[in-house]
């Protein structure tokens, strides 16, 4: 039986008349070309006499009568008068359950075809889409077990929440992401590795994520050597894949490492197009694109995307422009402390500097009270830490300090967790209850 609809669709996509343009200049990252009737976001093919395969490029702007293109590949063989052919399409990504367990590049093409064969997905999803309508978003009211005691007990997350992981380099961000991917109660994980070192990609997949974690995960990878537009697209491709699963009613966890490198890629694109540098050297488009990307995750009327975005904090400066902007957009932030990491305390989460803005909604009142008592122990001990270590504090002076000294080892032991250990949510609540001597009854809503 002939699938007539399939052929009708192909006819609709066909372009009977081919429109061509020519390259005029290549300056840095930008290709200037004369191409008629194109639009922002349209994909073009740049042909070279020295290469059989064309280079994909995207229309990113216009200057006078010229079209500004940014390549999605290497411009090595492109020269003056190279042909530019518009495709009439924007970038899309293939979606479907066949994506699970696969590793894709920044434009959604499979990187693991040697091991797993070609990608047999027939449905396509637009890389760019609008966030869910504010009135159609479901409220964040159901807790999501992350399987990490420090988060489940003191920074409880909800389905559809967006959380930032803020840390300097080398304090365990990738390890924490691997734990979240393995332990979280989600149907699908989508992980975007943006601007990572090439060596770290396989390390993350095999060591941090593991075979079990990969089975329900889609990995999108755009390493630091890729063109800036590819690194930029990697974030959008991963978000589009997560949206496609959300539209099927799935509970999705999206993780991106890192938003900082996404912002740097957007800065490169903006500067190449002539934007002026502003706050912190970033172009205005960076601060326009961040909310467009981050607002796409969350709940819809069909499913949920719970998102974790890592942010590189240079010199532990939480007020640098990207960190400050991301923190203002998201629903919570988890700070990883270099001091805790230096003490061998992993995960190096600092509960006193971190916050979940939905915890009071998704956690019960008894759970919240117990969490407050644990925080009080940590805060009291930290405030008197120097006096205690010097032996200058005399027991009996302050009951709160005495209580903190008696319980600090138990609290810190509770917050530590092995990388391969998964913490049960109810057991975590029971243990935090015993730490504080409180009673947690029906702490979990749902």
Where are these regions (language model features)?
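Phosphate-interacting basic helix/loop segments used at nucleotide- and nucleic-acid interfaces
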Residues: 3-8, 87, 146-151, 238, ...
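A generic structural signal for well-ordered coil/turn residues at beta-strand boundaries
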Residues: 19, 40, 99, 121-123, ...
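N-terminal accessory targeting/assembly segments
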Residues: 1-102, 106-111
